[in-house]
Design a protein with these regions (language model features):
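Long beta-strand-rich cores associated with HINT superfamily self-processing modules
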Residues: 547-571
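Extracytoplasmic/peripheral linker and loop segments enriched in polar/acidic and small residues
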Residues: 38, 334, 346, 441-452, ...
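Append "and occasionally in soluble cytosolic enzymes with long acidic Gly/Pro-rich linkers
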Residues: 326-433, 524
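N-terminal lobe/hinge region of extracytoplasmic solute-binding protein
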Residues: 50-100, 131, 219
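Aromatic- and charge-enriched surface segment that lines or borders ligand/interaction sites
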Residues: 95-142, 175, 266, 326-327
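Ligand-site clamp/hinge motif
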Residues: 209-215, 240-286, 441
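Gly/Pro-rich hinge or "lid" segments in bacterial periplasmic/extracellular proteins
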Residues: 184, 189-248, 252, 262, ...
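Surface-exposed binding/hinge segments that line
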Residues: 143-202
Length: 571
């Protein structure tokens, strides 16, 4: 009975929230948020930061950590390259020069950069990090990022004891030779955060992700070093006096996992200074607060979709198996998208901090297709019903829900990860409501985040339809998520035409350094995927950070030169 009451209450929230969308008179509508705080030269003090989700504890993004883990890692470790405002690579700790474009490249790292254990960052650390990804015992998702390095395949298969395409010139320089020329040889290359060879080489690679050196005592080269970790709850950091750009402005940073429904209250009380990865609902509450809270927002590379696990998958062999036919017909998927009022759904649960998307590429990227070239799948429940009727999905037993074309019961099993975000349940229930209005019986289930990821990684039999959001990077190429047999291709799509487009867009012999040629191919891919709909594009989001009136030197815009070591809080 308790579960039933809870579920009814969720549906009631959905009805109230969605019906209120058309009547909004939010006083902040149309007000543009800032992207940065004021500047200050203040030194010292402690910054308290809210984590909106608990980390799993794998504090290395090379070892297949979650977004929450990567957020923590960002406070104590750094990338070797950064990006400019056009999302292009920019020299930082490392610089590069082409020896033979797309075939051989030389990297140099700065001298004198220290790991938190006092050892100097060397080119051996970079080589070691790449060898971890190419090792046969590596269980993460990023081997495809290094497999085009000459000799990586032999090393991966145990036929060689080193990767022949990695040539150490000296302690700060290496040359990398690739098997075949690919246009994203730089943006797709592993440029950090790295693993320390001296610190970790005594740990078997198969045990790295579960080792204390990663989970309890991780080290990096960033401005703050880890002092204490309370698993799933908190991370304490202190300034690293030997940081390569100078002593950081703050003395300490405390990261605390806070229930999302309580974050604004914690900020109003002064317990929290900064909340990254904030939601639209938090931003709305912050703007109505009298505690001097400030909302920063900027365009991001985040987007969300509803996916379909289309094939069986052998994770150990990394091979896609037989088709799962339930959602095989793209017309069924189109009907499911037409049935969703995405505009209303986004207004209800993102409070203006997201917009509809019809592509699998965020519009910020230079390869993004013009929206006018894509079917926008505007909400049209009558069209959805007509498609379903034509396909043979009809309500034969007059129970209000459609059976499949063979007359069998048809139910959508839709999953979403659980967490402290109070919108997860109502926004999932809203999708259920949209689908059931066109006669598609839907079961929804929220699953613990770790198990959810594991089920997707293994294409578990009970994982059918699911929600996922992705954050893009400097490399706009979407192959990792949509190319057949890529570990991160959670939908397990097998679309030869899609694969061919993606391969052609990286083929240096076909596109060279001509970005227009490359973009033209990606636009063709987006048009194809927009028609094929292996998943349902839902939204692209904004980056939201909430701060109190004491935080200084924070800029969240992509490509900013503002560094974490300058971040400070006035007394």
């Amino acid at each position: 009975m308790g579960k039933l009451i809870k579920y009814i209450s969720i549906l009631l929230i959905v009805v109230l929230v969605l019906s209120a969308c058309g009547k909004s008179s939010n006083k902040d509508e149309g007000v543009k948020d800032a992207t940065k705080t004021e500047a200050s030269k203040h030194k010292g003090g402690t910054l308290n930061v809210a984590l909106t989700a608990p980390p799993s504890g794998v504090y290395s993004s090379l070892l297949n950590s979650t977004h929450a883990d990567a957020v923590v890692e960002g406070y104590f470790n750094e990338n070797l390259l950064t990006i400019d405002k056009k999302i292009r690579p920019k020299a930082y700790i490392a610089s590069w020069k082409d020896i033979e474009p797309a075939k051989k490249i030389e990297f140099k790292i700065k001298k004198g950069i220290k790991w938190h254990d006092g050892n100097e960052l060397k080119i051996d650390d970079w080589i070691y990090s790449i060898e971890v990804l190419a090792n046969k015992d590596y269980e993460g998702a990023y081997y495809p990022s290094v497999e085009n390095i000459q000799g990586a395949k032999d090393y991966h298969e145990g036929k060689a004891d080193h990767i022949s395409g990695l040539k150490k010139i000296d302690d700060y320089t290496m040359q990398v030779t690739f098997d075949k020329k690919q246009e994203n040889y730089l943006t797709g290359f592993i440029t950090g955060p790295l693993l320390s060879k001296k610190y970790l080489s005594d740990v078997p690679i198969k045990d790295l992700a579960k080792s204390d050196k990663i989970r309890k005592y991780p080290i990096g080269i960033g401005p703050y070093k880890v002092k204490k970790i309370v698993p799933g709850e908190a991370v304490q950091l202190v300034k690293f006096d030997d940081y390569w750009q100078g002593k950081p402005a703050l003395d300490k940073i405390n990261l605390k996992v806070i229930d999302q429904a309580q974050i604004i209250k914690a900020m109003e009380k002064g317990d929290i200074d900064v909340t990254n990865d904030a939601t639209g609902a938090m931003a709305k509450d912050a703007k109505s607060s009298n505690a001097g809270l400030k909302v920063l927002s900027a365009p991001s590379l985040d987007y969300g979709l509803i996916g379909f696990v289309s094939h069986d998958y052998d994770k150990k062999a990394n091979k896609t198996g037989k088709v799962r036919p339930k959602y095989e017909d793209k017309e069924l998927r189109k009907a499911m998208l037409y049935a969703i009022d995405r505009e209303k759904w986004i207004k209800a649960f993102f409070n203006g901090y997201a917009s509809e998307i019809n592509s699998f590429v965020p519009s910020m990227h230079w390869i993004a297709a013009d929206p006018k070239e894509l079917n926008d799948y505007k909400y049209d429940p009558e069209k959805a019903k007509k498609i379903l009727d034509k396909l043979g999905y009809k309500d034969r037993d007059v129970d209000g829900f459609r059976e499949d074309p063979k007359g069998n019961k048809f139910e959508i099993n839709f999953k979403h990860y659980s967490g402290s975000n109070p919108t997860f349940e109502p926004r999932t229930a809203a999708i259920k409501d949209f689908w059931e209005k066109v006669g598609l019986k839907t079961n929804v289930k929220l699953v613990e985040f770790g198990k959810y990821n594991e089920d997707l990684a293994n294409a578990s039999k009970d994982m059918e339809v699911y929600f996922r959001s992705w954050a893009g990077g400097t490399d706009p190429d979407p192959s990792d998520l949509y190319h057949t047999d890529r570990p991160q291709n959670e939908m397990r799509t097998v679309l030869p035409k899609s694969d061919q487009y993606l391969d052609d867009a990286l083929d240096f012999d076909k596109v060279g350094i001509d970005e227009k040629k490359r973009k033209d191919i990606y636009v063709k891919w987006q048009k194809y995927m927009n028609d094929e709909l292996p998943g349902l594009p839902m939204f692209q989001g904004k980056s939201i950070t909430i701060v109190n009136d004491k935080v200084r030197n924070l800029d969240i815009e992509i490509g900013t030169d503002q560094s974490l070591y300058n971040l400070t809080k006035e007394a």
